[in-house]
Amino acid sequence: MEDLAGFTGAGLNLTLPNVVGFDNLVAAITRVWASPFTARAFGWRQSHMTAPEHVYTSILLLESVASDKSGVLVTQDIDNGHSGVISVAVNEGLGGAVDGQAAESLRIDLETGAVRVLATATAPRRRVPDPEGGLIRLPSSGSDVVLQAAEIRQLIDFAQHLPDRFPPIVDDQGNPAPADVEFGFLDGDLRLFQLRPFLDSRMTGGIAYLHQMDASLRDSHKVRVNMEETPRTERRPRTC
């Protein structure tokens, strides 16, 4: 349900990083399971779906990786759509580029390896896993660059061989689409966390897409609801 035709729910539902301990994990599953039914999540779906109550939840459990740096890669130039260039945003620590921190932004030519720097990482702190659970913030290294040459070569190799290693990436119309990849580096080795069709630029727009969806809800406070009435739901034909 996170990615549907004309709708991306990236960042809409709850993600809990680095949950430590069995009891804490069970409690976290309950919170994540319920998150599609918060007023915020339900309201956004209601603006774009005819039956937003039809949500069939699944949860993905991933082992936490204490990445030295992490980011997002799109297999095209997000400014002009050129497929011979990859767009990369990366920060020190965990998840900074995904969550809108000021990231190192690069365009990397897949054929020549040439790198064009659009922005440098200026976030003063990086997020790292706390052994007791959750994340803590530590000072960033202050380095002028985040990605090193060897790491850039790994990203180029990954992007070049992606079509051979994974099923075709297509949009909701079945047409070829660029890949949106979340990655990290641990001790110089590339780690892949997520791969999906590229529907929206989280690197350039942050959560602008969700803010756009918010716009349709701005007048919702004017709607009056009779709490004694039975909620109206969409009627669907049933087969026996």
Positions of PLM-derived features:
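Conserved mixed alpha/beta core segments that line enzyme active sites in large multi-domain catalysts
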Residues: M1-A215
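N-terminal, non-catalytic alpha-helical interaction modules of very large eukaryotic scaffold proteins
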Residues: G205-C240
